[in-house]
C-alpha cells in the first residue's frame, strides 16, 4: 500500500504523438497519461518541445504562442501560452470524473497564435486509476434465514461490496470465515461486477445449532491491497412443507433505452401448492441489490410485476442484473430467488451535441475577430458528439450563414470555422452563423446552434472631409469671436479610432500666426474669428484644417483647405495725394495768359477700399459760381473754362469734393487756392508746383541720402590722407644734429648711403651744439610733460637764436662798413641788421663749405643715415632708418673729446696751417678759413677752393676738429627747376646767375635754421596765432622731443625774412615778396660757423647758463611765417 502511495507522488506520463490529417491548420494529436490525484501545478508536458518539428516550419517559431480551447468553467489542465507547458490546474479524481468507466481521459485543443499561421493540436490526457478506495458493503450485518430442510448446494445470493476503483484496484474476490456448513462462490455480473453466493455444503439441523455468524470479506487486487468485510448472521428455521418456486431461475430482458417509465418488464410467476397463508407469495428485491436497481426499477410485491421506474440510458448503463425473491406467508417460510438480467437496447434517442469554443473571452455565442485579418483566420472551434452508437452516433456538421466563413474538419467530430475572405467592419460589422449537426440514425436527429461573429474595428480609415476645399466669406469689421463656419470630417471607425479632433495648421499671414486670426473648436470643427478683419490689410485668408482621429498606435489624419474671403466695406474715405496739401489746402498757380481749356491741375486721390467702394468721382462744390473752371468727374482734371485775361479776379478758392461710390458714400473736401501770375513768374511757379506735386519716391530719397553720406565720407578720407601725407613729408627730413646726438645710444646697424634730400641743417648758436639728452624715460612719456619741458626752454632758445642771427649778419658786413645798432633788444638788432642786408650796404665775405670735417668724420656722417629720425620721404621707412631714435649721444660728443688738443702745438703756438684759426675754432671746430687762402677779391670765384666729398685731398690735415657745423644749403626739391644742386657740399651748377642765387638761398637756409629756434615750442605762445597756424604748429610739434630743435618746414625761413627784408625807413612799402620790390642781394653767403672770438672753451658751460637765464621778447609768429613764406617763394622764382 505504501509503495503505491509512493508512486502517486511523481507523474507517470507518456505521450503518444499521432500524425493527424493532412491539413494545413492541424498539427498533431497528442496523448498523455497521468495518474489521478496529482499535485496541482505538476507539469505534464511542454508543447514547444513536443511539436518542435511543426513549429520550425512556421515563419517565426520563436514568437509562437499557445492557447487552450477547453470546455468547462474550471479547467483541470492549464496551458502556458509562452511555451505550451501543460500542467494540472485542479485536483483530478478519476472516480468522480469517469466513475466505473474503464477509459477515462481529458480532451482539449490547443491552437497557436497568431492566427495567421494557425496550428491546431488535439490533446488527450488519460487519467489512470490508483487504488485509493477499499471495497465496502452496504450493511455491516447481513441477516440470512435458511430452513433446516434446505438441500445441500442451495445457493443464497449475498450482498455485493462496492469498490469505485477500476481494474485490479476494484473488487476482485470474496472470502468467508472458516466453518463446516457454508461456503461462498464469487460470480460476475453482466456489468462486470462481482458478487458472492452462499452455498450450503452440509445438512442443517436446527436442534443442533440454530444460527451461525460468519465474516464475509471483499478484497481487491490493487497495490497495496485493500479489503472490506461484513457479518453474515445465518438463522436456521424449522422445516416448511412447501416453498414458493419460480418458473425460471433467471430471466434476460431486452429494454429499449427510450422505453417510457412504467413499462412492464417482467411478470414474475411463482407458485406455492400450500393453501391459505402458507400458499400466499410476496415478491421483493433481494436484500443485497444495489441502490441504483432500487432507483431504476420497481416490483409489485403481490403480483410480481417488474416495471421501469426511471428512464434508462444505454450510453450510461448498458445492462442491469436484478435479484428478486418470492416468499410465502407461512411460518418458517423459505424464500425462493430468481435473477433478472435487463439489457438496454440502444436507440437513436440522442440528438447530436454541439459545443463552440471561442478564442476570445466573453459570451460563448459571440466570436470577435479584427477587420482586415487575412483569409483562413481562426474564428471558432466546433466540437460535435452523439451519445448514440453505430449510425445513430455518426454526425454530419454543416455551417450556414455567409460565404465569408467556412467550416473545416480537423479530426473525428472537431471542426474549425475560418474566414473565407478579408472582412471590412465598415461594410458589415456582424455576422450570424449557424452550425447544424445531424446524425445518421433512423429517423435522423439533428441539432442547430447559432452564434455571432462580431468584427472588431481597427484604425484603417482616416477622417474624411466632404470637400477638399471650402470657401467662405465674411465682412470686414466683424466682432472678435464671430462664428464663421463649420467644417466636418467623418471617420467610419469606432471608438477612439473614429473620434475626430480638428486643428488649424500653423501658417503666417503678414508675419502673424494664423492662430491669431482664426480658431477652431477641436471637437466639432466650428471656426471663429479672433480679431477684427480689415479688407485693406488682408483680403483673403487661406489656412489648412487638419482632422486627426484618436486611433492607436498610429493616428490617421486628413486635411482640407479653407479659403476665407474678407468682404470689403466702405470704411475708408478718399485720401488726396496730389497736389500737396497743407491744412487740407493747396495753392495752384495759373498764368495770366492761360486760354480756355488750360490744364490747371489734377487732383489725385486714392481709396484703400476696393471695388465700387474705391471708385472715386470729383466735383467742385463751391467757389466756381461763374463757371470759370470745369472738372472731369472721373479723372479729376481741372481746366479753365474761359481765358484768364478776361477774368477780373486774381485769386479763387475752389472747394472740391472727392467721394466714392460705396454705401454709404464717403467723401473728402479740399480747398484749392488758384492765383493768377504773370507769364514768366507763373511758369516758374507752375514748374515749382509740378515739382512739389510730384510724389516723393522713398527709394530715391534713400539712394540720394546714401550717396550723400558716401560722398562726405570720401571727402573726409581724402582730406585725412592728404594731411597725413603732408605730415609724413615734413617729418622725413634728415636732421643732422639730432641724429648726431642720438648716435651713441643705438646699436651698430648696417651702413647705408645718405642722400641730400634727407639732410636738414641745424645751426650752432654761439658755439654750442644741441648735445643734451634727447631721450625719454619710456616710450609712453606724457606729451603734456614734453610740452612743459619745451616751454621752459622757449625764452632761452629764442635768445640764443637772436644772438646767432646778429653774429651771422655781422660776419657778412665788410670791415670798412660802419655798423651802428641800437642794442635795445635782440629782436630790434636783428631787424636793423636785416634792413642793412636788404639795402645791400655790404659785400659778403667768402665762406668755404664742404671741407669742414676730416675724412673719418665724413665717413661717420655717411653712416649717420641709418640713425636718422626721419625716413627718406620716398615711401615706407627703409631698412636701417630710425624715425624715433632717442637716448643716444651724438658722435660729435665723441669728437669733442678726442682731437681738440691736437690742433695746437705743445708750446701753445698755432701751426702755420692754422694761422687763420680763431678762438671760435676751439668751440665750434675749424672752418674753411683755417686752411683755405682768402679770395683775391669779394667777387672772385671761390668755388675752385671747394672740397667735394669723396675726393682725396692730401693737403688736408688727417684730423679735423669735430665741432665744425655742417651748414649746407639744399636747393628745394619742389622747385620748378630740373637741375640738381650741389650747393650743400660747396658745388654749384655752372650757370652765370648761380652765384647770386646760391648766396641768397644759402642765407635763407641758414636764416631758416636759426629762425626755427625762434618759433615758440608750447601752446601758450601761440595764443595769437590763427586756428590754422595753431593746427600746423601742433602738427609740427609731434616729431621732436623736449630740449630738441623743433623741425619745421623749409619755408619757415621766411619767418624773419619777410618781416625784416623791408626798407627800415619805409615800413609801409611793399614787401620783397613781390616782383616790384627790391630783390635781396645775392652777393653774400652766411657764415653760421663763425662766432664771437671772446668765447673760450672753458666758458662753454657758462655761455649756456648765461643764455638760459636770458630774457627776450617773443615775436608775432603768425605774421613772420606768412611774410617769410612769401619771401622764399619770390627768391625761388628769381
UniProtKB/Swiss-Prot annotation:
Membrane topology summary: Single-pass type I membrane protein
Residue stretches of biased makeup (Polar residues): 791-800
UniProt-listed GO biological process terms: brain development; cell adhesion; homophilic cell adhesion via plasma membrane adhesion molecules
This protein's UniProt keywords: Calcium, Cell adhesion, Cell membrane, Glycoprotein, Membrane, Repeat, Signal, Transmembrane, Transmembrane helix
Annotated S-S bridges: none
Residues covered by region (Disordered): 768-800, 868-888, 941-1003
Topological region Extracellular: 28-699
Domain Cadherin: 28-137, 138-246, 247-354, 361-465, 466-576, 582-697
Cytoplasmic side: 721-1134
Glycosylation sites: 103, 269, 559
SUPFAM superfamilies: Cadherin-like
Ranges of compositional bias, category Basic and acidic residues: 868-877
Cellular component GO terms held in the UniProt record: plasma membrane
Transmembrane annotation, as ranges: 700-720
Signal peptide: 1-27
Subunit-level organization: Interacts with DAB1.
Identification of the protein by name: Protocadherin-18
Organism in which the protein naturally occurs: Bos taurus
